[in-house]
């Protein structure tokens, strides 16, 4: 016999509001960093055509964010042209992507350092949004902003040296694979996830790797960008068990499971975030 539960109006409202609040809390995009060009020559006034074009561009990106994980737009005539784009993580639902882009396009203009800047870039774990008065489409910036998020738990010493080569080899494999997903007609362009079992004499573990490039890059530049990320990881978090590294045109995330437990100085579950105006890769 079926069992039915009758909700009174107040109780139903409580559960409805609780579920709504929980959904909003869980889906809240996680901000990582905001970068703005601090050159005085790249300022604009609040009554300028550039400001109006920027608002139109950000609104356009918000509107397009429900259609896919990437879009770019160009608004206005020179010298007030604004170029912009968004890129969502490839495993997000359309709703989560749209939520992140909407949040990012609103927050980027609220940042005190970005209010009057012609160039800005905002990173969330789920997406990134940027705009500029100079076109950046199809380009890999070798010295642009970066964000790294990584665990303070480290690899056992016996596996440390071999892991870097394992990760580098894995990324090279995925660079070849990702080229086949470069078309904008693909369900998720330039996004590949791989789960592999790594067997070493010193121990075995599972390596979960995700790579993604902005679809405006060609396959060759996508590879350049991802190789820069690997070098960037070696400059910040070379022996971390988990890491995410973001450049303006590509992203890499890896996680390892099945290794013996080790403690970092702050605890094995501690996470650190490193960011900078200039990519650490070229200095390696």
From Swiss-Prot:
Residues 32-136, 151-259 form the Gnk2-homologous domain. PROSITE patterns: GNK2. Residues 1-27 form the signal peptide. Pfam families: Stress-antifung. It comes from the Eukaryota. It is found in: Secreted. One of its GO terms (cellular component) is extracellular region. Keywords: Repeat, Secreted, Signal. PANTHER family: CYSTEINE-RICH REPEAT SECRETORY PROTEIN, CYSTEINE-RICH REPEAT SECRETORY PROTEIN 8. Belongs to the cysteine-rich repeat secretory protein family. This is Cysteine-rich repeat secretory protein 8. It comes from Arabidopsis thaliana (Mouse-ear cress). The gene is CRRSP8.
